[in-house]
């Protein structure tokens, strides 16, 4: 019967990578000691009954010597107040004052493929309000590569320094991810691929030869 079992699919071994997401409540792993970049969840921006709310995800500001740090905001509304913008600038300054090498801000927002124009406008406004030494990055959905409007994707690219396309939901790789990745030739902007630790993953042969591909980020 053993010969009838389906072949096991290769999975993501975090030790083979150097860039990671670290969410609140997730215990740091040894792979972080050799990390080049760490994307740290700092806060959520929620749509509260009286306007947007900054929901802090970390009680203290750690000091991490070595890797580049991207602060991540998990965003549920694109309507921000001046108070939210002030809080963002204050947190960027606090992390830097603690001795961290903060290089950028990443927005984690589930922008629907059919509404990327509104997201592009938001990112353009946000870009203008960030300190000049702070990069702007975003996460993206796999569907963008297959069905995203090229002009809207170009507008987004004009405001951000990097896009990380996530091939997972929760703790599982998205079924059929290979079909979406086959459409990456439509992407004319620099991108990374976001993987989940332990999730199924087999690198497409064409990916590394794609001139826009910039590497991986692994969700721990």
PLM regions with names:
Residues 3-220:
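Secreted glycan hydrolases and related glycan-binding modules that recognize and/or cleave
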């Amino acid at each position: 019967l053993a010969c009838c079992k389906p072949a096991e699919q290769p999975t993501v071994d975090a030790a083979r990578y150097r860039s990671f997401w670290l969410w609140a409540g997730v215990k740091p792993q040894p792979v972080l000691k050799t990390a080049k970049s760490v994307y740290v969840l700092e806060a959520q921006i929620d749509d509260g009954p009286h306007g947007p709310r900054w929901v802090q995800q970390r009680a203290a500001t750690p000091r991490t010597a070595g890797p580049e740090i991207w602060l991540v905001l998990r965003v549920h509304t694109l309507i921000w107040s001046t108070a939210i913008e002030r809080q963002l600038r204050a947190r960027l300054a606090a992390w830097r004052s603690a001795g961290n090498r903060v290089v950028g801000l990443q927005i984690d927002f589930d922008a629907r493929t059919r509404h990327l124009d509104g997201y592009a406008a938001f990112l353009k406004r946000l870009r203008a309000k960030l300190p000049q030494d702070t990069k702007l990055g975003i996460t993206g959905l796999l569907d963008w590569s297959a069905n995203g409007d090229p002009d809207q994707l170009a507008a987004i690219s004009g405001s951000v320094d990097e896009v990380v396309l996530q091939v997972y939901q929760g703790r599982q790789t998205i079924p059929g991810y290979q079909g979406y990745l086959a459409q990456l030739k439509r992407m004319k902007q620099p991108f990374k691929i976001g993987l989940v630790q332990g999730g199924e993953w087999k690198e497409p042969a064409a990916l590394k030869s794609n001139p826009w591909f910039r590497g991986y980020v692994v969700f721990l």
